[in-house]
Amino acid sequence: MARPTGKKFDKRRQQQNPLFKRKKFCRFTAAGVEQIDYKDTETLKDFIGENGKITPARLTGTKAHYQRQLDTAIKRARFLALLPYTDQHKA
């Protein structure tokens, strides 16, 4: 049997799924940021997972241009001990 498709089915599925998340957007584009600063640790912490890994752009909605800057900024902050490498280190 064929699966139902179309807008009507999509709306019904979204209403039934309690885990449906709103559309992702790039926070840096919305804020008009040109460069991501490695010294802004509060912003960088939002993009680091619970175990210390950098969260991928497909989960955060960050554009590729800013994701590259974000990766570099997090790595610089880690090197300078502004951010921990893993969850076992205290920040």
Swiss-Prot record:
Determine if Acyltransferase is one of this entry's keywords. Answer: no
Q: Which Pfam families does the annotation name?
A: Ribosomal_S18
Q: What does UniProt give as GO cellular component?
A: cytosolic small ribosomal subunit
**Gene3D superfamilies the UniProt entry points to:** Ribosomal protein S18
Q: Which UniProt keywords apply?
A: Ribonucleoprotein, Ribosomal protein, RNA-binding, rRNA-binding
Q: Which GO terms describe its biological process?
A: translation
Q: Which GO terms describe its molecular function?
A: small ribosomal subunit rRNA binding; structural constituent of ribosome
Which SUPFAM superfamilies has this protein been placed in?
A: Ribosomal protein S18 (SSF46911)
According to its UniProt entry, what is the function of this protein?
Answer: Binds as a heterodimer with protein bS6 to the central domain of the 16S rRNA, where it helps stabilize the platform of the 30S subunit.
Q: Give the record's subunit note.
A: Part of the 30S ribosomal subunit. Forms a tight heterodimer with protein bS6.
Assigned protein family = Belongs to the bacterial ribosomal protein bS18 family.
Instruction: Kindly provide the name given to this protein in its UniProt entry.
Output: Small ribosomal subunit protein bS18
